[in-house]
């Protein structure tokens, strides 16, 4: 959903006591895909957005839970233009234990401690680890051809000791202002601090 929240400035200034955001547009892809959406993260300069589902069941009982790329140039009519690719062996992760599928995305929070990502996103994927995706312009040369999603990196830790699922369960992934990635396991694995070393920029 995309809302007009311009009226919040009046609340902040004290000229209005309350404000009800106005719905501008929405995209509905649950169904046919299983609900529900967890995170919506715009890339404002490109007028694109990432949206992640939330996996909530073990062993892919609510699969697939994906990361989507949307065109939000027309705020009243957001359109899905791509999905993040899966690995060839991801089917095996459905049987490995615990959850497998999309969850959180790095938030583009204003302030000095978060890296502002306008072309990429970093996603938590439970036993699929941490996955990095980029919205890549079409090489076709066709005007206004939509970008597509490419994976530019991933990290899947070993199963932490005593994790009840028998697998890692990466729950969050956040990128700081230096480009370091902080990811946590939702049970016993603690915090992982990662440095991206790929050739494609994490920007």
PLM features: what roles do these ranges have?
Residues 1-203:
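Feature marking well-ordered beta-strand scaffolds used for ligand recognition
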